[in-house]
A protein has these predicted regions:
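Acidic, metal/ion-coordinating pockets
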Residues: 2-16, 21-416
Length: 416
């Protein structure tokens, strides 16, 4: 007897179509209600009709319809329903588990305008298929998601994205976002709480931040193909200490103090099969990690992490293996406005594949171009692999995109 099994990509397409039908139905019902109300109002009016000289500004593409009053947390509602997580939708009872990680996603500036014109799926049109082929996918949300306007004036740049941009991340195939970075509080606690509310609305789980310290340092756990897998996120680049999550304060999980990180890893790793850490760290534009980062990564693995993935520096950095565990020091920008050029525009998807005999690491190069993540030709991919090998630590990248550990070369004779 044959058994039909819906793939993760097919499920994403089906849910996206269902969301669109819900939006259309909700807007149609709203329009009908407005017409009905307008008819009653016109019947009831005794005085002259109001002059229509004032025109309301057109709402940006995807702005949530005002079908109700704004909630106290700043998110608009009620909104059309969004359907739930897709993790493991194509998972059999056994077999390899493919985890995909992407770098910093910023849907402000030119990306915001492009989404308003082209829709939230446009930036991910060329990369979504690979994301959806994974069993679980993670991205760093490098922006507040809010309509709140009061900036944190201590920031050089303040980023905020429209809530509809989260639909693009969801439709692309992401199952989890890290909010542990130096931009999710760009519009203060109000904007941060809006961000959490909007993520909850789009049913995009988050890690690395929260309404209090307990939530910020909590691991996100999923079960895929019978394996319990946890994810943690921390930031070691936070503009102000008042961004740190505390018992009674919303904020970010900080990594300046190892005592904030290593005990959490030890605790969370006790009752799961695998634990992965997403770190926001490093010196911007540097193509290699600082020595302290290499030490820190090893300490996190010694504490119980099964892999470390980094972001923040806006460029790709190299890879390393430590005790059979993968380290990717920076996977770069993932989606950034169209001012990014050269190495700032080089991006890709990191895949960690869990197999019976260990974890495999591979990387698929892409490029940011005019507010999209695009595929490149074989020559570009070959150049990227050669470059990434040159800045990595004792790895070789094969034609199959696998990143393998190689034995260090012994020192030359007579030198120590």
């Amino acid at each position: 007897m044959s058994t039909f099994q819906e793939s993760r990509r097919e499920r994403h397409q089906r849910l996206k179509q269902r969301r669109r039908r819900k939006w259309t139905a909700a807007l149609a019902m709203g329009a009908a209600a407005l017409l009905f109300s307008a008819g009653i109002l016109l019947h009831a009016m005794d005085g002259p009709r109001q002059d229509q000289g004032e025109q309301a500004a057109a709402a940006p593409y995807g702005a949530p319809p005002t079908l109700g009053k704004a909630r106290g947390n700043g998110a608009m509602g009620p909104l059309p329903p969004v359907y739930g997580p897709t993790a493991g939708a194509n998972a059999a009872a056994d077999g390899p588990i493919r985890l995909v990680f992407a770098g910093d996603a910023l849907m402000d500036w030119s990306v915001k305008e492009t989404i308003r014109k082209q829709g939230p799926d446009y930036p991910f049109a060329h990369v979504a298929e690979e994301i959806q082929e994974a069993d679980f996918a993670v991205v760093n949300l490098e922006t507040a998601v809010t309509f709140h306007n009061q900036k944190d004036t201590n920031q050089l740049f303040n980023f905020k994205s429209d809530p509809i941009s989260l639909e693009g991340l969801k439709n692309a195939g992401f199952d989890l976002v890290s909010i542990a970075n130096n931009h999710t509080l760009d519009f203060k606690q109000k904007g941060f709480l809006d961000t959490l509310a909007n993520l909850e609305h789009y049913e995009l789980p988050f890690m690395g931040g929260g309404k209090n310290g307990e939530e910020a340092y909590r691991a996100h756990e999923v079960t895929i193909k019978g394996k319990r897998i946890k994810f943690l996120a921390f930031s070691r680049f936070i503009p102000q200490t008042y961004w740190f999550a505390a018992d009674d304060r919303p904020g970010i999980a900080e990594a300046y103090n190892k005592s904030s990180v290593l005990p959490v890893i030890r605790k969370e790793s006790q009752d799961c099969d695998y634990l992965f850490v997403y770190m926001h760290w490093g010196v911007e534009k540097n193509n290699k990690p600082e020595p302290w980062q290499r030490t820190y990564a090893r300490e996190m693995i010694d504490a119980g992490a099964d892999g470390i993935v980094g972001s923040h520096v806006h460029v790709l950095q190299g890879f390393e293996w430590y005790n059979g565990k993968p380290i990717a020091y920076s996977i770069g920008n993932f989606l950034f406005p169209n001012y990014v050029k050269g190495k700032n525009a080089d991006t890709g998807l990191l895949t960690l594949t869990i197999e019976d005999d260990g974890i495999r690491m591979s990387f698929s190069p892409y490029q940011i171009y005019r507010d999209q993540i695009i595929k490149k030709d074989a020559a570009y991919v070959k150049r990227q692999f050669k470059y990434l090998e040159s800045i990595s630590y004792d790895v070789a990248i094969g034609a199959d995109r696998a990143i393998e550990a190689i034995q260090s070369k012994p020192p030359a004779s007579g030198k120590h």
